[in-house]
């Protein structure tokens, strides 16, 4: 994805100011910065989740494979299949585990029959590292799983419609350390097939899972580069101050 001069307004308030960056394919890009810096707002621009907010206006250019995602001819439902989203709080549908995964492929016409749908469900759960844990209870409610398992259901649900990009908005913030470690391991495995963008408040998590890191402050992108450089040799004083804990 390529982003150029993006601004976001909520009414008269400007939340994102002139942000531009390239999101590299088959890598994990982490967005870091203090609370309220705009990183989640910017993330939601990438698949037009901000469209659901009446007073939100987005200007600038965001392209997926060269195509303007804000073009008026874009099918937003199709866009959100290509650029999936995993939210901060696990939000499985109030359906069975099977139906949570099958729903997307069914409505998008991806599966041509029950056997193909079964294959997609199994493959998606396998990629999310959950198949062995749930294969004997696929008809059980997705909401009955543990928090970490529910988040992996949500990741499998995104995978099931063959996205190019997966957006993750603080996917581990509601999870315990063991579940967090499983999600981080999963992110590392998924990046060989998907472009992943993750918002995180944890600099340690950004350092562990990402290849590139973007630091936001007061709605502006201050610095973006390879993760090791951002954490060991930042070029901007604001980045240095945040990384070293002088503010947060």
From Swiss-Prot:
The keyword Cell membrane applies. CDD domains: ABC_PstB_phosphate_transporter. ATP binds at residues 33-40. SUPFAM superfamilies: P-loop containing nucleoside triphosphate hydrolases. Signal peptide: none annotated. Keywords: ATP-binding, Cell inner membrane, Cell membrane, Membrane, Nucleotide-binding, Phosphate transport, Translocase, Transport. One of its GO terms (molecular function) is ATP binding. Disulfide bonds: none annotated. One of its GO terms (biological process) is phosphate ion transmembrane transport. Gene3D superfamilies: P-loop containing nucleotide triphosphate hydrolases. Pfam families: ABC_tran. It is found in: Cell inner membrane. InterPro entries: AAA+_ATPase, ABC_transporter-like_ATP-bd, ABC_transporter-like_CS, P-loop_NTPase, PstB-like. It is a peripheral membrane protein. GO terms for cellular component: plasma membrane. It catalyses: phosphate(out) + ATP + H2O = ADP + 2 phosphate(in) + H(+). Its EC number is 7.3.2.1. Residues 1-243 form the ABC transporter domain. The complex is composed of two ATP-binding proteins (PstB), two transmembrane proteins (PstC and PstA) and a solute-binding protein (PstS). Belongs to the ABC transporter superfamily. Phosphate importer (TC 3.A.1.7) family. Part of the ABC transporter complex PstSACB involved in phosphate import. Responsible for energy coupling to the transport system. This is Phosphate import ATP-binding protein PstB. It comes from Rhodospirillum rubrum (strain ATCC 11170 / ATH 1.1.1 / DSM 467 / LMG 4362 / NCIMB 8255 / S1).
